[in-house]
């Protein structure tokens, strides 16, 4: 009985030591000795760990051995220090919007955000604010994408069309109206910087989705502008925007969601109307 108890205690000690070693493995890293060592404070959260709570973990990166962008540092940390660090990324060119996160207090894309070369200050990296976190720097985008789907982002016609029978032409002026709208990459930087979206995401569509809604409302080839506007004619969908302008300030593509929302409000209140489609010259 005593031997069995001793064996149990010894096994428990081994398990505890193993747990401590595992928890410290991610934090352990070689001491950097270069001249340009930059500290990154990164949000960590693993929902699969029992009783998991968010923490901030520090990583030191030698900038002389790293690329110039935040995403370069994250990839270096994941490849060389902690393979459990989780984040989204794809194009590395500011096109796909996958690597959107909060860097130094501002929402932006990690692939086009340059590392602050001032090594006396650390750089703080968090997931996009006010969204559920899947793991580490990966936010849950399900609600955002569902809202995007709700605006039916495709051309809708009231006249029957046979694919390939004819083209839907636009004049130069009609096409110009889409500039500054279609370039949105749906990264959600603007929506997650908006206080109205923080507190009313279940009802307020948010800057990114509203800008895309306006893009389809104003498209001269679309015949369902009134129906699209009708779906937004309530107290929350568009009018919850209080023109704080965070969305326009933070957009990594330098678009102006606030202006698009203002145009939607003008259409909803009757101050403006959608221009009639120009007769085709083709």
Curated annotation (Swiss-Prot):
Its EC number is 1.3.5.1. [3Fe-4S] cluster binds at residues 194, 241, 247. A ubiquinone binds at residue 199. InterPro entries: 2Fe-2S_ferredoxin-like_sf, 2Fe-2S_ferredoxin-type, 2Fe2S_fd_BS, 4Fe4S_Fe-S-bd, 4Fe4S_Fe_S_CS, Beta-grasp_dom_sf, Helical_ferredxn, SDH/FRD_Iron-Sulfur. It is found in: Mitochondrion inner membrane. It catalyses: a quinone + succinate = fumarate + a quinol. GO terms for molecular function: 2 iron, 2 sulfur cluster binding; 3 iron, 4 sulfur cluster binding; 4 iron, 4 sulfur cluster binding; electron transfer activity; metal ion binding; succinate dehydrogenase (quinone) activity; ubiquinone binding. Residues 43-131 form the 2Fe-2S ferredoxin-type domain. Keywords: 2Fe-2S, 3Fe-4S, 4Fe-4S, Electron transport, Iron, Iron-sulfur, Membrane, Metal-binding, Mitochondrion, Mitochondrion inner membrane, Oxidoreductase, Transit peptide, Transport, Tricarboxylic acid cycle. It is a peripheral membrane protein. Its cofactor is [2Fe-2S] cluster; [3Fe-4S] cluster; [4Fe-4S] cluster. GO terms for cellular component: mitochondrial inner membrane; mitochondrial membrane; respiratory chain complex II (succinate dehydrogenase). Iron-sulfur protein (IP) subunit of succinate dehydrogenase (SDH) that is involved in complex II of the mitochondrial electron transport chain and is responsible for transferring electrons from succinate to ubiquinone (coenzyme Q). Belongs to the succinate dehydrogenase/fumarate reductase iron-sulfur protein family. This is Succinate dehydrogenase [ubiquinone] iron-sulfur subunit, mitochondrial.
């Amino acid at each position: 009985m005593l031997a069995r108890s001793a064996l149990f205690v010894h096994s428990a000690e081994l398990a505890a030591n193993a747990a401590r070693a595992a928890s410290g493995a991610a934090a352990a890293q070689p001491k950097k000795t270069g001249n340009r060592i930059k500290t990154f404070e990164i949000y960590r959260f693993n929902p699969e760990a029992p009783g998991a709570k968010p923490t901030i973990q520090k990583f030191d990166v030698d900038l002389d051995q790293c690329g110039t962008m935040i995403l370069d540092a994250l990839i270096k940390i994941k490849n060389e220090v902690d393979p459990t660090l989780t984040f989204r990324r794809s194009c590395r060119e500011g096109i796909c919007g996958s690597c959107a996160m909060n860097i130094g207090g501002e929402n932006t894309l990690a692939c086009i955000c340059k590392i602050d070369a001032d090594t006396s200050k650390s750089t703080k990296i968090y997931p996009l604010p006010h969204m559920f976190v899947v793991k580490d720097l990966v936010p849950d985008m399900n609600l955002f994408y569902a809202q995007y789907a709700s605006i039916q982002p495709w051309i809708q016609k009231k006249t029957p069309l046979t694919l390939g029978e004819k083209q839907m032409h636009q004049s130069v002026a009609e096409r110009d109206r889409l500039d500054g709208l279609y370039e949105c990459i749906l990264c959600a930087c603007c929506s997650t910087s908006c206080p109205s979206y923080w507190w009313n995401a279940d009802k307020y569509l948010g800057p990114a989705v509203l800008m895309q809604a306006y893009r389809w409302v104003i498209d001269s080839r679309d015949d369902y502008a009134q129906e699209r506007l009708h779906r937004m004619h309530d107290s929350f969908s568009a009018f919850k925007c209080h023109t704080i302008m965070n969305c326009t300030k933070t957009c990594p593509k330098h678009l102006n969601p606030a202006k698009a929302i203002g145009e939607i409000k003008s259409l909803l209140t009757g101050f403006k109307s959608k221009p009639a489609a120009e007769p085709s010259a083709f």
